[in-house]
Amino acid sequence: MMSPDLDLNFSSNCNLYDHRPVARVLIPLVYSIICPVGLLGNALALHVVISSTTKINSITLYSANLAVSDILFCLSLPLRAVYYGLGFHWPMGEVLCKAIALLFYLNCYAGVNFMTCLAVDRFVALVFPARLAKLRKAKNVRFVCLAIWLLVLAQTLPLLTIGLTKTEPDSSITCMEYPNFEGVFKGLPYMLIVAVVLGFGIPVMTIIACYSILTHKLHQAAKSNQLTERSGKTKKARGVIAGVVFVFVVCFSPYHIDILQYMIRKLLYETDCKELQSFQISLHITVCLMNLNSCLDPFVYFFACKGYKQKVMRMMKWQVGTHFSSVKNSAESSGTGDVLGTRRNNRIIMNNVGEDQQICYQPSAT
């Protein structure tokens, strides 16, 4: 293994940004899609979760915190898109780089933890509904949510103590790039391996285990009750579970596996410039994939939550109704009755948006 000084000099003499012409177009393009979709989708999800329930429970608390973490995460993307659009150049200073890094990593791993909590909560609701009922009480869940935010904040605050920007040989200033960390932490490979295990390995195993048991239990329930199977509820629940697991694994696995394999190689032998270049490119690709999770979560809400789906459809109907109302109003000056009828329909739709809806499918009554 290289010494920190040699490792730093090695990365400085190795051109890690040959893919700049492609990255400065594709990455901002991806972020320009993820950011608005993620912000709008999660804002709507948060609105549905908060406004469409008469009683706060564990599911609504975890879902609301997940939506908040996704929204805050999306807020870090515009400046990151500017950075990539400028060809890996950060002209906004060290302080703002640290602030964006903190916002990025804090909400990324807060989201992972809240997704894990949702999996455990649904598992407890089905397998141990009476024995572990205290864990699902709103008062206790609030403490769990607060503990998650504080824990992830404590893990990411050290980022503020180190320099995250670096002036490259071509005078460009990079921000939050892997080579900027080399030489700062002596045991960087060990630290990142532990971080991957704690921040991704344990959560993904927990999520897969909980949802696998849930799927098995739902399958058993469907076999013993044909009426339940014919209703399609268990089939829908299994589909939702598969979607949640699929989105989590596809979005988060490549990034963490990429880091893990490279850190293991660094511990086994001295990696060369070509390997570091490949790792740098793969990091930029897998980070984009990980960011995609923040705008896919609302689609999981859409299919899993009745209230979310109905509110989206009603808002779309209201927009269509308003459009046709405007067209008729301008084209038919004498068509007063039709216009009034359209307005009445719009008012009905707007009133229905405020109705209480079932937030999320839960596998058993609690």
From Swiss-Prot:
<feature type="topological domain" description="Cytoplasmic">
    <location>
        <begin position="51"/>
        <end position="70"/>
    </location>
</feature>
<keyword id="KW-0812">Transmembrane</keyword>
<keyword id="KW-0807">Transducer</keyword>
<feature type="glycosylation site" description="N-linked (GlcNAc...) asparagine">
    <location>
        <position position="9"/>
    </location>
</feature>
<comment type="function">
    <text>Probable receptor for oxysterols that plays a central role during humoral immunity. Promotes activated B-cell localization in the outer follicle and interfollicular regions.</text>
</comment>
<dbReference type="Pfam" id="PF00001">
    <property type="entry name" value="7tm_1"/>
</dbReference>
<keyword id="KW-0675">Receptor</keyword>
<comment type="similarity">
    <text>Belongs to the G-protein coupled receptor 1 family.</text>
</comment>
<keyword id="KW-1133">Transmembrane helix</keyword>
<feature type="topological domain" description="Extracellular">
    <location>
        <begin position="89"/>
        <end position="98"/>
    </location>
</feature>
<feature type="topological domain" description="Extracellular">
    <location>
        <begin position="162"/>
        <end position="187"/>
    </location>
</feature>
<keyword id="KW-1064">Adaptive immunity</keyword>
<feature type="topological domain" description="Cytoplasmic">
    <location>
        <begin position="306"/>
        <end position="366"/>
    </location>
</feature>
<dbReference type="InterPro" id="IPR000276">
    <property type="entry name" value="GPCR_Rhodpsn"/>
</dbReference>
<feature type="transmembrane region" description="Helical; Name=1">
    <location>
        <begin position="25"/>
        <end position="50"/>
    </location>
</feature>
<keyword id="KW-0297">G-protein coupled receptor</keyword>
<keyword id="KW-1003">Cell membrane</keyword>
<feature type="topological domain" description="Cytoplasmic">
    <location>
        <begin position="121"/>
        <end position="142"/>
    </location>
</feature>
<keyword id="KW-0325">Glycoprotein</keyword>
<keyword id="KW-0391">Immunity</keyword>
<feature type="transmembrane region" description="Helical; Name=7">
    <location>
        <begin position="281"/>
        <end position="305"/>
    </location>
</feature>
<feature type="transmembrane region" description="Helical; Name=5">
    <location>
        <begin position="188"/>
        <end position="210"/>
    </location>
</feature>
<dbReference type="GO" id="GO:0002250">
    <property type="term" value="P:adaptive immune response"/>
</dbReference>
<protein>
    <recommendedName>
        <fullName>G-protein coupled receptor 183-B</fullName>
    </recommendedName>
</protein>
<keyword id="KW-0472">Membrane</keyword>
<feature type="topological domain" description="Extracellular">
    <location>
        <begin position="1"/>
        <end position="24"/>
    </location>
</feature>
<dbReference type="InterPro" id="IPR047160">
    <property type="entry name" value="GP183-like"/>
</dbReference>
<feature type="transmembrane region" description="Helical; Name=4">
    <location>
        <begin position="143"/>
        <end position="161"/>
    </location>
</feature>
<feature type="topological domain" description="Cytoplasmic">
    <location>
        <begin position="211"/>
        <end position="236"/>
    </location>
</feature>
<feature type="transmembrane region" description="Helical; Name=6">
    <location>
        <begin position="237"/>
        <end position="260"/>
    </location>
</feature>
<dbReference type="GO" id="GO:0005886">
    <property type="term" value="C:plasma membrane"/>
</dbReference>
<feature type="disulfide bond">
    <location>
        <begin position="97"/>
        <end position="175"/>
    </location>
</feature>
<keyword id="KW-1015">Disulfide bond</keyword>
<feature type="transmembrane region" description="Helical; Name=2">
    <location>
        <begin position="71"/>
        <end position="88"/>
    </location>
</feature>
<feature type="transmembrane region" description="Helical; Name=3">
    <location>
        <begin position="99"/>
        <end position="120"/>
    </location>
</feature>
<dbReference type="InterPro" id="IPR017452">
    <property type="entry name" value="GPCR_Rhodpsn_7TM"/>
</dbReference>
<dbReference type="GO" id="GO:0004930">
    <property type="term" value="F:G protein-coupled receptor activity"/>
</dbReference>
<feature type="topological domain" description="Extracellular">
    <location>
        <begin position="261"/>
        <end position="280"/>
    </location>
</feature>
<dbReference type="GO" id="GO:0008142">
    <property type="term" value="F:oxysterol binding"/>
</dbReference>
